[in-house]
UniProtKB/Swiss-Prot annotation:
Positions of region (Recognition domain 1): 25-339
Effect of residue 692 to A: Slight decrease in target DNA cleavage, 30% DNA cleavage, altered non-target strand cleavage products
GO molecular function: deoxyribonuclease I activity; DNA binding; lyase activity; RNA binding
Any further remark recorded for this protein: Part of a type V-A CRISPR-Cas system.
Known outcome of mutating residue 663 to A: 25% DNA cleavage, altered non-target strand cleavage products
Region LKL, important for PAM recognition and DNA unwinding, residue ranges: 662-679
GO process annotations (BP): defense response to virus
UniProt protein name: CRISPR-associated endonuclease Cas12a
Catalytic function, reaction form: Endonucleolytic cleavage to 5'-phosphodinucleotide and 5'-phosphooligonucleotide end-products; RNA = a 5'-hydroxy-ribonucleotide + n nucleoside-2',3'-cyclophosphates
Chain intervals for the UniProt region annotation (RuvC-I): 893-953
Effect the entry attributes to changing residue 704 to A: Significant decrease in target DNA cleavage
Subunit comment: Might be a homodimer. Might be a monomer.
């Protein structure tokens, strides 16, 4: 029996079951006759327009409300003080002070906005559908805008004018539930949390720092060069922009023209919160063009630029100012280059032309083109005329890519910086920094989001001091790499000339000729041009400082460099959406899966199923001959199933579902029993009224209006519960639920009683209705009847039904209804998808078809029916999405992990560890070990199936990936891999689940960050996080279809072995029986001795090599064994491992993978024998080794760099445990350290209870880390927090001591 036998019904969870709907009888004919589909299709299109209209209203509201927000000067000044201190010192306390300063301002703004009357209606039905006799806020605003002659919608808008907008909004009167999700999304716009799309974030996180930087520049400029700006001319030219209503410094309310000094008063930042204020401020900085005038009216930046040229002082450019970001949802907030969905070829070429014309016409604040600006910037950078301490590289994959590109080694820059920073922080303790020093080093290296160019320059200079001349990595080579950027612009310009001819060819609207094979050359030309532009952006990306990340670091930047660079970068960044839209257009599928919601003239369709609500929600469920049906009543005939109709039409045929629900007992019971019309019937006593008035029956409830809240009284609570019990027994409907309540004295709170009511306040019964009556109302168009359908209900269905079918059937099963596990929920939805491709028979019935799966022993199949490719898109389809609750009566899963750990502590001796690794030769590999670490089972998940047929998914996915990779590069149609992946994963998850139950196993994965998961293997094989998520969700509610319906593991008693999934970040290191252990040192570790390579030999120079080899205790030739031995203590190389002393040997051979010039530089493999390599090397340099004595001194006495380069290479070969041969499945592990019997582990000769290859070794050692956790769980003291963190030294000690 499984130890998890009682881990059932632990918590409830919700699922949405999805089915097709098949119209019955005259249903489809009647629907079309009434135009119901057309009505809902129009409503779906109008909904998109309505969202645009509501966004316009949000713009208006934001503009209006922010014009009256006033952030106190004290708060602004405090923010400023901390901000500038933080630029000088990255102190943790200052970071906290800065966060506090931000949060205080955000809170003040948020409270002001939320207190406004208009805000209260922004997200409820009153925005669109006001109370009777009143006009909604939205309608009123539209009418006022029309009366005031305000033009809300531009010429190219989807909405013609305000009259159309009014008609659209009025059409949603009574349909406001449509906007529930949209309103939730728009609430983020007003959030005070760190959400970049919030107006408060835009003010405090984005624009306030920019304003403060500009203020500081203005004050410095006035001090250094007061004559640079013509103040009087600006005041004259930009009088409109300098006019403000309020001077927040003096609190003067008087519309007047401000001086520049007043513009930069910190209190007057309040004038630049909304878009009109931002536009004014930006114009003051950048100037403006005025119709009819030949010259531009200069802003501050132009004056700085002119003065800098006049006195020939480029240093003044640092005073140029940055414009503020546009306010969220403003017309100008979105990028200037807006790309809609591309509908035809004309859209493609027109959009491309617009993009390149805009790039060519774009001018920076210096009135220069993008090419000219970047050329000058990078020329100055190459000449190192800029302050390198204030220019940064992004410290991510961009930096390692740059290192590879410039130095042909991805690790050079990172290694140089690490060594340099370590030397700065721990000069006396380089090999073994203290914990505090390690934290500081990490903060300035791998954890730093940006590295200054000065740091990189100094690091490389220091790095080169210890490297041979031909191994030098010069900083200048990095700068030269960017100086070549103008050449890329020239190449783009050449290819852009071809675009004109292509545009002419494809300018006709409505055509999709670019999707045809004949357009392949033109598609390639388009792609080449976009690729070049995209590559340019990627090259520049390393300099780009993300706005949100800058807030965390408060980088001290070269303001002029970033001012003009970011202008260019953001303009070029429009290539990303353009590229994606055009690629998606070219590679689009021939069919569309777009669907829209059906309402059948009822805004509350299927909102609930309660019998009393049937006339309102007009949706009813039926069962007939083990098939399920959904009926939708015509809105005008919504009483065709009232009690009278049911009574008159009883008979054989259909069973109608009668649904009764007592929802929200805490609100429903008092609402009913104390309502004005019912209070006499339920007749509460004076004592009960007293209890209710003062809320003494609740701990935190509210008293009735006009009464004071008295302290909770348990006796009053129980009196109130007895009143509720008596009243329920009187209620005409609720008395039939058959409530079985606990003894009143057992309740300790009113909430306990409410929970009992809700758990029993759900009831499904059935009424028989004659088939003739149903047929009659369908034929008359009073009822639209659909069969609820999936493949399990097909006459051709074979095998077991899927879980959604089992769940659906369980809803109506008497065994479920006796003690409810599955509950049917409201909020169901119906959808419609139109046919998008013609129906064409791919394989006629009764004709043999070759099986695609080469692993299938049956080579051909014959079907009794025609096969049609993508058949589901060749027909109009109806769909039904229905939510349900599983484990309806169960409570939450607050301490689920603790419960699991307590069980494992009690049953530790019966538990196995199932560890899963993501392999290089395996999609996934598992190892099952017992409580002593012995391997019980191990195998690959490459091949899944049964004895009749197994499928090699590794090969199938690899083949598809290869095709997809080629198609992606050439913009060809991409084969769908998603369904195969999910089919594969569902089978893997099922196999894991079986092992878990059979062996009482916990599951262990490596805790890899998302980037590592995405980057370690080919992208298309990145099934692992999906595997983890699918496994978690499977173990949320684990049903084995073979198990009996009401037995453990069956539909009614599913295992629950993981906590509900939210996000991987929130999940931490455990979710139920799944644990995450640190990644690293799992596949490249000796499974017998526990040896891991932490030497990492690397040739840099003769002196460094001499120093390195001198640290070995002994280097000699073993005369008895015939191989070389290197003895050392890790402590001499830095304290990195639990066991210090090791002897590694040149035993055996290794496989080296390399680019073979004789094979067109493709990957190839050669076998090398380290012992022979060393023998030859030592002989070549006349070093005697045959005596068996230590030769360390002779080695360190050499001075030839070729000698040490080769010796280092051979030592790396000896340390190479993992060996794989290109193009084959060969992937073995060989250890350089002998065990106590003098044997070297080699997975090719390993017994079945040891890892069989390198991937198996990875899974095995993940399992050993899991075994460590199991030991901690077993020994954990009650009440003490379980430590799930495994440090490397703890892990090394564990594995190295296991076999000793």
């Amino acid at each position: 029996m499984s130890i998890y036998q009682e881990f059932v019904n632990k918590y409830s969870l919700s699922k949405t079951l999805r089915f097709e709907l098949i119209p019955q009888g005259k249903t489809l004919e009647n629907i079309k006759a009434r135009g119901l589909i057309l009505d809902d299709e129009k409503r779906a299109k109008d909904y998109k327009k309505a969202k645009q209209i509501i966004d316009k209203y949000h713009q208006f509201f934001i503009e209006e409300i922010l014009s009256s927000v006033c952030i106190s000067e004290d708060l602004l000044q405090n923010y400023s003080d901390v901000y500038f201190k933080l630029k000088k010192s990255d102190d943790d306390n200052l970071q906290k002070d800065f966060k506090s300063a931000k949060d205080t301002i955000k809170k003040q703004i948020s409270e002001y906005i939320k207190d406004s009357e208009k805000f209260k209606n922004l997200f409820n039905q009153n925005l669109i559908d006001a109370k009777k006799g009143q006009e909604s806020d939205l309608i009123l605003w539209l009418k006022q805008s029309k009366d005031n002659g305000i033009e809300l919608f531009k010429a190219n808008s989807d909405i013609t004018d305000i009259d159309e907008a009014l008609e659209i909004i009025k059409s949603f009167k009574g349909w406001t539930t449509y906007f529930k999700g949209f309103h939730e999304n728009r609430k983020n716009v007003y959030s005070s949390n760190d959400i970049p799309t919030s107006i408060i974030y835009r003010i405090v996180d984005d624009n306030l720092p920019k304003f403060l930087e500009n203020k500081a520049k203005y004050e410095s400029l006035k001090d250094k060069a007061p004559e640079a700006i013509n103040y009087e001319q600006i005041k004259k030219d930009l009088a409109e922009e300098l006019t403000f209503d309020i001077d927040y410094k003096t609190s003067e309310v008087n519309q007047r023209v401000f001086s520049l000094d007043e513009v930069f008063e910190i209190a007057n930042f309040n004038n630049y919160l909304n878009q009109s204020g931002i536009t004014k401020f930006n114009t003051i900085i950048g100037g403006k063009f005025v119709n009819g005038e030949n010259t531009k009216r200069k802003g501050i930046n132009e004056y700085i630029n002119l003065y800098s040229q006049q006195i020939n002082d480029k240093t003044l450019k640092k005073y140029k100012m940055s414009v503020l970001f546009k306010q969220i949802l403003s017309d100008t907030e979105s990028k200037s280059f807006v790309i809609d969905k591309l509908e035809d070829d004309s859209d493609v070429v027109t959009t491309m032309q617009s993009f390149y014309e805009q790039i060519a016409a774009f001018k920076t604040v210096e009135e220069k083109s993008i090419k000219e600006t970047l050329s000058l910037l990078f020329d100055d950078l190459k000449a190192q005329k800029l302050d390198l301490s204030k220019i940064y590289f992004k410290n991510d994959k961009s930096l390692t890519d740059l290192s590879q590109q410039v130095f042909d080694d991805y690790s050079v820059i990172g290694t140089a910086v690490l060594e340099y920073i370590t030397q700065q922080i721990a000069p006396k303790n380089l090999d073994n920094p203290s914990k505090k020093e390690q934290e500081l080093i990490a903060k300035k290296t791998e954890k730093a989001k940006y590295l200054s160019l000065e740091t990189i320059k100094l690091a490389l200079e220091e790095f080169n001091k210890h490297r041979d001349i031909d191994k030098q990595c010069r900083f200048e080579e990095i700068l030269a790499n960017f100086a070549a950027i103008p050449m890329i612009f020239d190449e783009i310009a050449q290819n852009k000339d071809n675009l004109a001819q292509i545009s002419i060819k494809y300018q006709n609207q409505g055509k999709k000729d670019l999707l045809q094979a004949s357009a392949e050359d033109d598609v390639k030309a388009i792609k080449d041009l976009l690729d070049q532009t995209n590559n340019l952006l990627h090259k520049l990306k390393i300099f780009h400082i993300s706005q949100s990340e800058d807030k965390a670091n408060i980088l001290d930047k070269d303001e002029h460099f970033y001012l003009v660079f970011e202008e260019c970068y953001f303009e070029l960044a429009n290539i990303v959406p353009l590229y994606n839209k055009i690629r998606n257009y070219i590679t689009q599928k021939p069919y569309s899966d777009e669907k829209f919601k059906l309402n059948f003239e009822n805004s509350t369709l299927a909102n609930g199923w309660d019998k009393n609500k049937e006339p309102d929600n007009t949706a009813i469920l039926f069962i007939k001959d083990d098939k399920y049906y959904l009926g939708v009543m015509n809105k005008k005939n919504n009483k065709i199933f009232d009690d009278k109709a049911i009574k008159e039409n009883k008979g054989e045929g259909y069973k109608k579902i009668v649904y009764k629900l007592l929802p929200g007992a805490n609100k429903m019971l008092p609402k009913v029993f104390f309502s004005a019309k019912s209070i006499k019937f339920y007749n509460p006593s004076e004592d009960i009224l007293r209890i209710r008035n003062h809320s003494t029956h609740t701990k935190n409830g509210s008293p009735q209006k006009g009464y004071e809240k008295f302290e909770f009284n348990i006796e009053d609570c129980r009196k109130f519960i007895d009143f509720y019990k008596q009243s329920i027994s009187k209620h005409p409907e609720w008395k039939d639920f058959g409530f079985r309540f606990s003894d009143t004295q057992r309740y300790n709170s009113i909430d306990e009683f409410y929970r009992e009511v809700e758990n029993q306040g759900y009831k499904l019964t059935f009424e028989n209705i004659s088939e003739s009556y149903i047929d009659s109302v369908v034929n008359q168009g009073k009822l639209y009847l659909f069969q609820i359908y999936n493949k399990d209900f097909s006459a051709y269905s074979k095998g077991r039904p899927n879980l959604h079918t089992l769940y659906w059937k369980a809803l109506f099963d008497e065994r479920n209804l006796q003690d409810v596990v599955y509950k049917l929920n409201g909020e169901a939805e119906l959808f419609y998808r139109k046919q998008s491709i013609p129906k064409k028979i791919t394989h006629p019935a009764k004709e043999a078809i070759a099986n695609k799966n080469k692993d299938n022993p049956k080579k051909e199949s014959v079907f009794e029916y025609d096969l049609i490719k993508d058949k589901r898109f060749t027909e109009d389809k109806f769909f039904f999405h229905c939510p349900i609750t599983i484990n309806f009566k169960s409570s939450g899963a607050n301490k689920f992990n603790d419960e699991i750990n307590l069980l494992l502590k009690e049953k530790a001796n019966d538990v196995h560890i199932l560890s899963i690794d993501r392999g290089e030769r395996h999609l996934a590999y598992y190892t099952l070990v017992d409580g002593k670490g012995n391997i019980i089972k191990q195998d690959t998940f490459n091949i899944i199936g049964n004895d009749r047929m197994k499928t090699n998914y590794h090969d199938k996915l690899a083949a598809i990936e290869k095709d997809r990779d080629s198609a992606r590069k050439d913009w060809k149609k991409i084969n769908n891999i998603k369904e195969m992946k999910e089919g594969y994963l569902s089978q893997v998850v099922h196999e894991i689940a079986k092992l878990v139950i059979e062996y009482n196993a916990i599951v262990v994965f490596e805790d890899l960050n998302f980037g590592f998961k995405r980057g370690r293997f080919k992208v298309e094989k990145q099934v692992y996080q999906k595997l983890e998520k699918m496994l978690i969700e499977k173990l949320n509610y684990l049903v084995f279809k073979d198990n009996e319906f009401d037995k453990t593991g069956g539909v009614l008693r599913a295992y629950q072995l993981t906590a509900p999934f939210e996000t991987f970040k929130k999940m931490g290191k455990q979710t139920g029986i799944i644990y995450y252990v640190p990644a690293g040192f799992t596949s490249k570790i000796c499974p017998v001795t526990g040896f891991v390579n932490q030497l990492y030999p690397k040739y840099e120079s003769v002196s460094k090599s001499q120093e390195f080899f001198s640290k070995f205790d002994k280097i000699c030739y073993n005369l008895d064994k015939g191989y070389f031995e290197f003895s050392f203590d890790y402590k001499n190389f830095g304290d990195k491992a639990a066991k210090g002393k090791w002897t590694i040997a040149s035993f055996g051979s290794r496989l080296i993978n390399f680019r073979n010039s004789d094979k067109n530089h493709n990957w190839d493999t050669r076998e090398v024998y380290p012992t022979k390599e060393l023998e030859k090397l030592l002989k070549d340099y006349s070093i005697e080794y045959g005596h068996g004595e230590c030769i360390k001194a002779a080695i360190c006495g050499e001075s030839d760099k070729k000698f040490f380069a080769k010796l280092t290479s051979v030592l790396n070969t000896i340390l190479q445990m993992r060996n794989s041969k290109t193009g084959t499945e060969l992937d073995y592990l060989i250890s350089p350290v002998a065990d106590v019997n003098g044997n070297f582990f080699d997975s090719r000769q390993a017994p079945k209870n040891m890892p069989q290859d390198a991937d198996a070794n990875g899974a095995y050692h993940i399992g050993l880390k899991g075994l460590m956790l199991l030991g901690r769980i077993k020994n954990n003291q009650e009440g003490k927090k379980l430590n799930l963190v495994i440090k490397n030294e703890e892990y090394f000690e564990f594995v190295q001591n296991r076999n000793n």
